[in-house]
């Protein structure tokens, strides 16, 4: 079951379904998706939006039909530019993302573009990059979506970590955090 709505995902998970939750990036309370690293040093320019790249396991079955290395490469450009990066620190259960966005050493948060978990009676995959819009002109997003849905249909989709609906909502819509402001590094 693919949805962009947390409410629909919660309902489907309560019914024991497998869900790919792909919220609108504007609805996610996180960091602006960037492909390039932070400029210079976060010590001197601490409020820069951006991360230090991607770290993932290219052999993870969720990425079986999405060619990648364990690090950022050009196929990730569109995925990152059309994403809001999720911060998983509030989960407090050592959640290991499928696709980790590497934070800078100054903040060192647990950042994710893609993670999986058991939720309610179902199984959940959350992707914070837009996998819905303009897929006819975005072959990379189309391929990642295909790979994730194929993974969910398989017996290999068996998340180990468990999260509550409240925790998922916190990651996506935490009212206690605000999006990092987009500032020029020269201000």
Question: Which residues does each PLM region occupy?
Answer:
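Catalytic beta-strand/loop cores that center a nucleophilic Ser/Cys/Thr
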Residues: 25-32, 41-139, 157-187
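Short, well-ordered secondary-structure micro-motifs within conserved domains or adaptor modules
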Residues: 1-38
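A general structural signal for well-ordered secondary-structure junctions
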Residues: 19, 154-158
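Functionally constrained cores in energy, signaling, and assembly domains
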Residues: 10, 22, 116, 124, ...
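Short amphipathic C-terminal alpha-helix that caps PH/PH-like domains
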Residues: 140-153
């Amino acid at each position: 079951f693919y949805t962009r709505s947390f409410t629909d995902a919660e309902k489907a998970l309560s019914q024991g379904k497998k869900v790919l939750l792909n919220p609108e990036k504007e609805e996610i309370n996180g960091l602006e998706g960037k492909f390039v690293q932070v400029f210079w040093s976060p010590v001197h320019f601490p409020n820069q939006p951006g991360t230090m790249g991607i770290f993932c396991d290219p052999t993870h079955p969720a990425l079986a039909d999405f060619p990648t290395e364990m690090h950022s490469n050009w196929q990730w450009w569109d995925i990152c530019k059309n994403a809001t990066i999720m911060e998983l620190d509030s989960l407090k259960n050592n959640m290991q993302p499928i696709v980790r966005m590497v934070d800078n050493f100054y903040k060192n948060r647990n950042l994710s573009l893609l993670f999986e978990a058991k939720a309610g009676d179902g199984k959940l995959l959350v992707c914070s990059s837009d996998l819905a819009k303009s897929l006819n002109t975005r072959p990379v997003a189309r391929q990642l979506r295909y790979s994730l849905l194929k993974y969910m249909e398989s017996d290999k989709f068996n998340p180990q970590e468990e999260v509550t609906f409240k925790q998922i909502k916190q990651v996506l819509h935490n009212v206690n955090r605000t999006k990092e402001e987009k500032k020029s590094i020269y201000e």
